[in-house]
Amino acid sequence: MVSIPRDTRTEIVGKGFQDKINHAYAFGGPEMAIDTVENFLDIPIDYYVQVNMESFKDIVDAVGGITVNNDFDFSFEGYTFNKGQLSLDGKEPLAYSRMRKEDPRGDFGRQDRQRQIIQGVIEKGASFTTLTNFSDIMGAIGKNIQTNLTFDEIVGIQKNYKDARHNVEQSMVKGQGTRIDGIYYYSVPEEERTALSSMLKEHLKINDSITKR
């Protein structure tokens, strides 16, 4: 699981200039965002899932809440999160994942908590076997998620890859903050981008002949 910092400076495919990677979606929706991330990581991306984080509580509640491990005590948006293992439901996961300013790691700490939330949903969702549970989840997904996966493909992933949740690796994109013309960017060295791309290709069992389209 890889989180790309939103301020990462890279080429916006289809625009022909460099900008923050999260601007690709604003310029051209999921298609331009996918093209830009594909170019940045040099790997093919066949599917996407766009999540409405403001309504993510519906998905968390549909799986019966989630469990996370919190690194330090903090309060945010009226909620208090103590250090240690926490059970979250309702609007708690969104508040937990959004806090940034009190975290000594800043946006990287927020990215880690966002990955925890996603991992928690995967853990709970993959363990469901009854039709009722699955119907609740699909109902929540239908309201809050946009994807190019078909229903059968979603069912197939839940059925065939649920054990993969026990073997999830998390990677951070290494770089440093910089200012160009007064605007803050996250600059990723070419050697780091190449190393990350190679790692992903190895895990995905793809080679350069596939990525060179």
Can you describe what each PLM-predicted range is?
Residues M1-R213:
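Non-catalytic, solvent-exposed segments at the cell envelope interface
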